[in-house]
Design a protein with these regions (language model features):
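Hydrophobic topogenic segments
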Residues: 153-206
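Short amphipathic alpha-helical boundary/capping segments
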Residues: 94-103, 125
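Short amphipathic helical patch at the helix-1/turn junction of helix-turn-helix
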Residues: 11, 113-115
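A short, charge-rich alpha-helical start-of-domain segment used by transcription regulators
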Residues: 1-19, 29, 43
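A short pre-motif secondary-structure segment
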Residues: 109-110
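DNA-recognition helix of helix-turn-helix
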Residues: 127-156
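Σ70-family region 2.3-2.4 aromatic/basic alpha-helix that recognizes the −10 promoter
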Residues: 14, 22, 32-47, 52-89, ...
Length: 206
């Protein structure tokens, strides 16, 4: 596989991979750096031109996931940084803030299963868990997220006056159904610079 073909392959999966890494690490720029580093390491693992991975989604997700956990082990706890604040409505802002309070293992499972919709088989393959273990951990993760979301104070960065904001009203309603707040976490846009940086790291001039 040539470097440009590898970049094109990563482009099929870059949006969910970036969205995952940014939310795992609590910031867009950290997410970008992690994604580039993980994909560059993947190219090295393929020995700079090996065959395409047999299961690309599983392979890329595992690469980025491992890189995120390595970064978290070095850095410690995360917070939902200001650059995530403009990526969604007031419900999404609150969901991001609640996710940031969770232990990484729980945040990981919620992002993979409830936000990005990995099916149970793929989730188990990526996390190296049995289906029973994954379901048990997801149950605990959802409960912890629910408690964190319900306990959050009213947002202070609403673009409207909170009394006039339908998203804030929805956020208050979801205090009783906090799992639904995760549905507000949409995909995060990948900047063109990310792909350019990956090409540079791989030595591809295209």
């Amino acid at each position: 596989m040539q470097a440009e073909a590898y970049v094109e392959l990563t482009a099929r999966y870059e949006t969910p991979l970036f969205s995952y890494s940014a939310r795992m690490l609590g910031g867009l720029r950290d997410g970008e750096r992690c994604l580039i580093a993980a994909l560059t390491a993947g190219w090295t693992e393929l020995e700079g031109g090996g065959a395409e991975p047999a299961r690309p989604q599983e392979w890329f997700t595992a690469l980025v996931r491992e890189r995120c956990f390595d970064e978290l082990a070095r850095r410690g706890a995360v917070s939902a940084e200001d650059d995530l604040a403009g990526t969604g409505d007031c419900v999404a802002l609150a969901a991001d803030a609640a996710l940031a309070t969770l232990r990484p293992a729980y945040r990981d499972l919620l992002l993979l299963r409830d936000v990005h919709g990995l099916d149970p088989a793929l989730l188990c393959a990526v996390t190296d868990m049995s289906e029973a273990d994954a379901e048990n951990q997801l149950y605990r993760a959802r409960a912890e997220f629910a408690a964190a979301f319900a306990a959050l104070p009213a947002p202070d960065r609403c673009p409207l006056r909170r009394t006039d904001c339908p998203d804030c009203a929805e956020r208050e309603r979801l205090r009783t159904q906090p799992a639904h707040a995760l549905l507000h976490l949409g995909p995060l846009e990948v900047r063109d610079q990310v792909r350019s940086a990956l090409r540079a790291a791989l030595g591809s001039g295209s």
